[in-house]
């Protein structure tokens, strides 16, 4: 009964969100910034800010990130060589439209033996509560870990002005991290995007 009730609430919630997004109600928080047709995308080597995220509750997400136990972790502790961070919003129509493409990017990485254990993807929900992030995950069947950023603290540290924004970070699993890519407004081709991430990270 509780599961059915939750599903109904999520369904209503997503319908309302879709209506508000389509009407432009949340337009100020979700935009493609000036630049190319898909926004700004450029190499942006530099420091990646330190912040902590909650260790995922599900074993699948913990295993994917190479984490264990409970508490918090830093992006640099993820067991990988590169982490692609998507900053999204549940209410962002651009994020909604590109959700399937980002899911395909995840699958593309997972199918490549040379990248599967080296490149990981996570999402951070700008101004989204845990409930909104869960609703986004369920509605768009997102296969990679998502984290809420309800107070925008992480989003502001990252320097993100609009959603979606993609950030490429090199990591070593021990806490060291460096930004190598910053792209506002998404990207148009998964293969080209992944090739660029690999090139910039030195994989």
Task: Place the predicted regions along the sequence by residue.
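Thiol-/selenol-based redox modules, centered on thioredoxin-like
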Residues: 168-203
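Conserved segment of the thioredoxin-like fold in thiol-based oxidoreductases
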Residues: 111-150
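Short, internal strand/loop/helix patches
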Residues: 136-172
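Bacterial N-terminal signal peptides
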Residues: 12-22
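Conserved redox-active cysteine motifs that mediate thiol-disulfide chemistry
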Residues: 87-104
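N-terminal "domain-start" segment that seeds a small globular fold
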Residues: 30-74
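Bacterial N-terminal signal peptides that target proteins for export
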Residues: 2-13
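Short pre-active-site segment immediately N-terminal to redox-active cysteine/selenocysteine motifs
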Residues: 81-83, 88-91, 162
């Amino acid at each position: 009964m509780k599961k059915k009730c939750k599903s109904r609430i999520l369904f209503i919630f997503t319908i309302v969100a879709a209506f508000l997004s389509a009407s432009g109600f949340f337009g100020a928080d979700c935009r493609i910034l000036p630049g190319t047709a898909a926004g700004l995308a450029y190499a942006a080597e530099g420091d990646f800010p330190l912040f902590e995220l909650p260790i995922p509750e599900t074993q699948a997400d913990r295993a994917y990130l190479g984490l264990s136990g409970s508490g918090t972790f830093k992006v640099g502790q993820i067991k990988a060589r590169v982490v692609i961070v998507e900053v999204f919003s549940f209410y962002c129509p651009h994020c909604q439209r590109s959700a399937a493409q980002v899911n395909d990017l995840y699958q593309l990485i997972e199918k490549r033996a040379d990248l599967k254990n080296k490149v990981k993807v996570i999402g951070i929900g700008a101004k989204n509560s845990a409930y909104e992030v869960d609703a986004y995950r369920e509605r768009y069947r997102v296969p990679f870990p998502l984290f809420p950023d309800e107070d925008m603290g992480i989003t502001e540290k990252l320097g993100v002005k609009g959603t979606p924004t993609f950030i490429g970070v090199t990591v070593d699993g021990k806490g060291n991290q460096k930004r190598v890519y910053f792209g506002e407004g998404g990207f148009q081709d998964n293969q080209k995007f992944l090739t660029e991430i690999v090139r910039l990270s030195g994989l």
